[in-house]
Amino acid sequence: MTNCTDEDLDNYLLNQVDLRHRQVSKCVEDVQKIIKDLTTEVSSKDARFQSIANAGVHNASLKDQPALMSKWSALLRGRCAYNPAIQVLSPTLYLISVPLQGLMGYKERRTRQWRYYTLTGSRLLSPVREPEKLHQWLELESFVNPSQEWHDARMTIEGDIVPAKVVNVFKDLLETSIKTRGLTNKVSVLESVGTAVRVAVETSEAQIEVKLVPTVELMNYWPKRARWPRLFRRWPSTERARCIKSFGFNLMASSNYHWLLSFSRAEQVLLSNIDEDGGCRRKCYRVVRQLKEDGWCPGSKPVITAFHLQTLLFWTCEKYPCTRDWKDFRGCVLRLVQKLHKCVSQHYLRHYFIRSHNLLKYSNTNELDEVAKKINHFLENPGTYIH
């Protein structure tokens, strides 16, 4: 067995991980500028879609909540250079949420049980399938004060705000905006399966595939199905958990009928001060992410993404909450890799906030098995990878 030392890991961080971070940061900067221009143009044509500059606590609906905005700024000051709407899933694959406007005062309510409509509005003999654990219906009546513009047959059917219809309107506006802004040489719309809007963005470093998803941002509200924090858990602290829940969650238009629950703001806050006790959690995450991208799971559409690794880190932090558990850099990296190997081998990784949902449920099992073999080889010979 070829072993590795803390010094080897520190050199790996300096020579490989930091280089990757600089390259990705440059690409994010380029993509952010282009998508901001495009979504600003889209918003000028239809105010229901906002610029990504208004994502998160910059959302226009939060102007009357300065305390929440101040809290967010204080938490992420100096720690988060990226726009909160942008999630880097791999060096060449980004997910960007496009905030929606005009849906105010959300409250969870019991929705009617069955839907019998198609996306074109015609009737079905049997009902549309029910949403899975990480999805839900979204009705106009869930909002105290939806703007009149949302009472629009192009986006709703029988009182439901239908993701596929919202995406279709957005896609038409986006294609027009690419031409209006003269960005046809930098942005091209890709063929998509389902409701996704996928574009290829040319940057100074690489071509980036971007998935654009219209998103309802729900601040100061935590969904009942996300039973978190769990009883008798010591990480994060009660105060931090209360703060995180105040930032709410998102509903993303990522399927035909149902809206996907997303906790991206909560995840950003969890990461922002994850090592305030002087631990090495974030360093471990960065090393494992680099190993994944270099050898275990490379490519533009990896079966394991940065989101999976982030989720794994949160579960590991919860299981090992003490400062002393995160002092041995080498040991902590190997522990995280071992946990990743177990999840990939079993094809099972629980969502951190809705733990009944398996994030690997629909992943390609052959690809997962191949990744598991590579991770196992690393665990047998870590020194051959860390140099």
From Swiss-Prot:
This is Protein mab-21-like 3. It comes from Danio rerio (Zebrafish). Belongs to the mab-21 family. Pfam families: Mab-21 (PF03281), Mab-21_C (PF20266). Gene3D superfamilies: 1.10.1410.40, 3.30.460.90.
